[in-house]
Swiss-Prot record:
The gene is rpmE. Belongs to the bacterial ribosomal protein bL31 family. Type A subfamily. It comes from the Bacteria. The keyword Cell inner membrane does not apply. Gene3D superfamilies: Ribosomal protein L31. NCBIfam families: L31 (TIGR00105), PRK00528.1 (NF001809). The keyword Nucleotide-binding does not apply. This is Large ribosomal subunit protein bL31. The lineage of its organism: Bacteria, Pseudomonadati, Pseudomonadota, Alphaproteobacteria, Caulobacterales. It comes from Phenylobacterium zucineum (strain HLK1). Keywords: Ribonucleoprotein, Ribosomal protein, RNA-binding, rRNA-binding. One of its GO terms (molecular function) is rRNA binding.
Length: 74
């Protein structure tokens, strides 16, 4: 079997939108890095019934709404 074919799998810290943190294993970054979530199961409209607004990071939501906003149900 080939050596060094798998990426490094190590522990990182995940920070949810409400500040809750937990450790998990990942191939992201390096040992001890932190992943800050913009959206998580506690704030995602699909899991909360759509009551929360999405944060517009980088204008993606605005661009999407500008392009497809006319197709929404009223």
């Amino acid at each position: 079997m080939k050596q060094d074919t798998h990426p490094d799998y190590h522990f990182i810290t995940v920070v949810m939108t409400d500040g809750t943190t937990y450790k998990t294993r990942s191939t992201l970054g390096k040992e001890g890095d932190t992943l800050n979530l913009d959206i998580d199961p506690k704030t995602h409209p699909a899991w909360t019934g759509g009551g929360h607004q999405l944060l517009d990071r980088g204008g993606r939501v605005s661009r999407f709404n500008a392009k497809f906003g006319a197709f929404t149900r009223k």
